Swiss-Prot record:
Signal peptide start and end residues: 1-26
Quaternary context: Interaction with RLK5.
Protein name: Protein IDA
Free-text comment about domains: An extended PIP motif (50-69) is sufficient for abscission induction.
Lineage: Eukaryota, Viridiplantae, Streptophyta, Embryophyta, Tracheophyta
Induction of its expression: By wounding.
Function of the molecule: Involved in an ethylene-independent separation step of floral abscission. Promotes abscission zone (AZ) cells rounding. May act with RLK5 and HSL2 as ligand-receptor pairs.
Molecular-function GO term, any one: signaling receptor binding
Region (RLK5-binding): 56-69
Gene from which the chain derives: IDA
Organism of this sequence: Arabidopsis thaliana (Mouse-ear cress)
Gene Ontology cellular-component annotations: apoplast; extracellular region
Keywords from the named record: Secreted, Signal
Anything else known: IDL1 is capable of replacing the activity of IDA while IDL2, IDL3, IDL4 and IDL5 are only partially redundant.
Tissue: Expressed specifically in the floral abscission zone.
């Protein structure tokens, strides 16, 4: 029973070393990766939030429209 347990522990240790060494090698920065030296600051020009808005078109006001929201005698007297 003891030799079988020793072989299982040794096999698990070898598998652990193989798995951890492959993960470390993948995370290491090599010559194939390009590092950016100039990091842009988050401003209004290059912000992702303002990139979704249309360019050159004014944003309509958020007030209710007087054309389709006006009912005659809608106020209680």
């Amino acid at each position: 029973m003891a030799p079988c347990r020793t072989m299982m522990v040794l096999l698990c240790f070898v598998l652990f070393l193989a798995a951890s060494s492959s993960c470390v090698a993948a995370a290491r920065i090599g010559a194939t990766m390009e590092m950016k030296k100039n990091i842009k600051r988050l401003t209004f020009k290059n912000s992702h939030i303002f990139g979704y808005l249309p360019k050159g078109v004014p944003i309509p006001p958020s007030a209710p429209s007087k054309r389709h929201n006006s009912f005659v005698n809608s106020l209680p007297h």
